Amino acid sequence: MDQRLERILPRVQKPARYTGGEYRQIIKDKAEVDLRLAFCFPDIYEIGMSNIGMRILYATMNQMPGVWCERVFAPWGDMEAEMRRAGIPLYALESGDPVSEFDVVAFSLGYEMAYPAVLNMLDLAGIPLRSADRPELTPLVIAGGTACSNPEPMAPFFDLMIIGEGEEVNNEVLALFRQAQQAGWSKTRFLETAAKIQGVLIPSFYVPHWNPDGTLHDLTPTHGAPARVTKRIIQDLDACYYPTDPIVPSTEIVHDRVNVELFRGCIRGCRFCLLYTSPSPRDRG
């Protein structure tokens, strides 16, 4: 552990949020991986570790040979102040390495209230906020989750967004990214190729047009991007990996119990709800 971190932890609430080392966390040999991904949840540890979607995707991406997915959470106010005062950048729990050193920085956007935390985490990591200010392929800043169904509010900040469910498309994007790294592709070439994957939205490839009242009128696609991105849906949940040995938190979390996904979707079909546009509930066997 960074000695600077050891000095500040006694001065913050719930230091176990920031130490890692939990039972069943996934540790890999850096010499045996060629793609490192910082999986960022834009809220505090207790909320992020209660999120079953994050647990599923963390385990799924770590199933890929040569890929190491590590967790990153937003610090509470006291810890953020101490980190900024001590010059400690945002870091991953598993290795303690700065987020800026990772190949891919991926955010889970479950709700719009997390948007400010995303920008704060990027700033704390020392990563330029806007995609246009990050011309290199790495770090690639991406996002997925329910809130990406309305991508335009955060479009200037992400290089790539996942629309729909991530178990399959995440792995496809990571496989393409590894190919791009090995072949020395430019960021633009990678994004143009990634735009052909179902469920992938490249925000910079769409020019927004606004109404006089400030609302969005339409988007003009560029770089050969599709006019409409079709979201990815997992039709057979049993065909996807599901973690049976999740990480055991070292401190109390919001849902301090075992979470099991029995089905995905909703039978109600309320027209005002995003789930109305998703398939009827799909059960796990």
Language-model regions, residue ranges each:
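Glycine-rich beta-alpha loop elements in corrinoid/cobalamin-binding modules
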Residues: A74-P221
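Non-catalytic terminal/interface segments that mediate subunit docking, oligomerization
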Residues: V254-V258, R268, S278
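Residue-level signal for short, function-critical loop segments
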Residues: F41-Y45, Y111, R264
